[in-house]
Amino acid sequence: MSTMNKEKLKGLQSFLKDDIWRVTEDEVSKSRGILYNAIKIATLSVREFTQGRILNKASALTYSTLLSIIPILAILFAIARGFGFSNLLETQFRSGLEGQSAAAETILGLIDSYLVHAKSGIFIGVGLVMLFWTILSLTYNIERTFNYIWQVKKPRTLYRKMTDYFSILLLLPLLIVLSSGLTIFMSTMVKNMEDFVLLAPLMKFLVRLVPFILTWAMFTGLFVFMPNTKVKLKYAIIPGIIAGTAFQAFQYLYIGSQIWVSRYNAIYGSFAAIPMFLLWAQISWGICLYGAELCYVAQNLRNYSFSKETANISRRYHDF
């Protein structure tokens, strides 16, 4: 029995390492072809993710995020105040730092101080320039990482960077408010429909699904928009769903860990949130970049040379 199991295991290893790469879609049924393609994409994406040292790129983006988080939040809150929904944005921000109220208040104080110094006194010009330059640097690093994954050598022009990136910053607070408003609306609907035995559970499920749908859309849009090349939407949807689901699952774990860490606030104070934020940023960027790798492999699957020596697969060609 043990010998048979070893033979089956060797056969499976041989199939995954060699045979599956020689199978074409015409030789198998449609469902089996989809399964084989999924296995190929998963295998190649993990290989490219590890061999390309993408986690090192995630660490670099974590460092850039740490330097840019206050300026970015300052811009978002400034835009929110301009539209008159800063209180709603603050509520969302505090809920994201559940269990770390001291850290949340410290960050909000830094944001207010940053905005005051950026628009007052003799340093108004320098402050605004530094504010926008910090944000532009982070978005440039994000684009450069996505271009690295997609093997794109030419970045966006400076004009396109400014127009594209600041359009995102303008839309982001609006999307946050839309998400909050939609969740509140559906929660109200659930309360009003408690007497409807069949519809109430469905509405509760939809309320819980809203954050996932918005996160899926966010990652899908990021995978399509951020690389400076043509990315087909159909190849970004499933990676967006996978990355978005992983991100939401990690968010639940992160919020739970924040509540646990809050017990140590008497010792560490608001500094207890710093290592947690670094961990959150590192894992979040890792999830995001793996999703981008999935998207790249899915779009370029046919251009890979599926030979016996799969380690020599070329990444130089793109399917547009």
Please provide the spans of the model-predicted regions.
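Membrane-embedded alpha-helices and immediately adjacent juxtamembrane helical segments
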Residues: 2-320
